[in-house]
């Protein structure tokens, strides 16, 4: 039943998907351009650490936005499956499988953004490191997360 209604009118699903994609794009631009773009100083671990420490709440909001972006990927993946299933159920399942893996990997990778907060708080056990070493370690975690790690 649902199958035939999708074949007749996929516009509703496509519009919902479009709204989800717009939200994903806005959240991605916010996290990348506004948060990391203003707080991460390319090539300068100490300046980056100082900027994150000074704007910790902005950094946390950026992480939350990034994770929300990946949560919104889940209904988008379901919508893509629903829209593509009438064309080829096998390919729709394959696309769903790969999209779910991509989302899981990206969401797990975004957790690296929490590491600078932990390193800069200097929680127990980090006393052996100098502040410069902690700044370098936190910057390294950011490079693991970033697509711009080709510096």
Tell what function each PLM region has.
Residues 42-57:
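Perimembrane loop-to-helix junctions flanking transmembrane segments
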Residues 53-70:
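Interfacial helix-start motif at the membrane-water boundary
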Residues 23-42:
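Alpha-helical transmembrane segments of multi-pass membrane proteins
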Residues 87-103:
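Interfacial segments of alpha-helical transmembrane regions
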Residues 33, 100-126:
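Transmembrane alpha-helix/helix-exit interface in multi-pass inner-membrane proteins
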Residues 1-10:
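Short, Lys/Arg-rich, polar N-terminal cytosolic tail immediately upstream
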Residues 144-149:
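Conserved small/polar residues in nucleotide/adenosyl-binding loops
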Residues 115-143:
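Membrane-interface interhelical connector segments
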